[in-house]
């Protein structure tokens, strides 16, 4: 887990995007200083590499609350309107890998809530799902991502998906 302390890095801004039926997204912009050879001074360690887990926390030191948990997906250099060089990290929630690749699968004699828990469990996520009641003899996932299939099954049962870290 990465800890970016404002005394260590000059954090320009941090944005967190959360919505129902969407995977959380966050961006953090850190000041990147220009050195003599017109190269950018990017932190030399690997804490900003894609795949690194990151946690956004805020509040007084005795009452810190977590606003976002996820992993770095991309990093880039940008120049803003004030000609300030920024090192921008884009992060996604832990459910993000469920959007990779379309899959085919058949679930037999299963309830939708059990299927949702099983799929999300493959990505190290825990799910709190209301009971869906009806056992379906054969449920087919055809050429869609696991995330899209989870959303479809939740919507068919009048449920919404809200991600929060590894839940």
Regions from the language model: what does each represent?
Residues 25, 99, 116-141, 167:
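N-terminal export/assembly leaders
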């Amino acid at each position: 887990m990465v800890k970016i302390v404002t005394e260590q890095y000059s954090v320009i801004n941090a944005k967190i995007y959360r919505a129902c039926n969407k995977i959380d997204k966050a961006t953090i912009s850190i000041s990147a200083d220009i050195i003599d050879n017109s190269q950018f001074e990017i932190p030399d360690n690997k804490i900003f590499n894609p795949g690194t887990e990151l946690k956004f926390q805020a509040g007084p030191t005795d009452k810190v609350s977590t606003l976002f948990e996820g992993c770095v997906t991309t990093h880039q250099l940008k120049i803003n309107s004030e000609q300030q060089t920024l090192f921008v990290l884009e992060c996604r929630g832990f459910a993000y890998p469920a959007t990779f690749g379309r899959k085919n699968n058949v679930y037999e004699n299963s309830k939708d809530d059990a299927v949702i828990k099983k799929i999300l469990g493959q990505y190290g996520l825990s799910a709190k799902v209301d009971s869906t009641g009806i056992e379906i003899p054969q449920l087919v996932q055809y050429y869609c991502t696991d995330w899209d299939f989870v959303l479809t099954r939740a919507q068919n049962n009048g449920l919404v998906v809200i991600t929060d870290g590894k839940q």
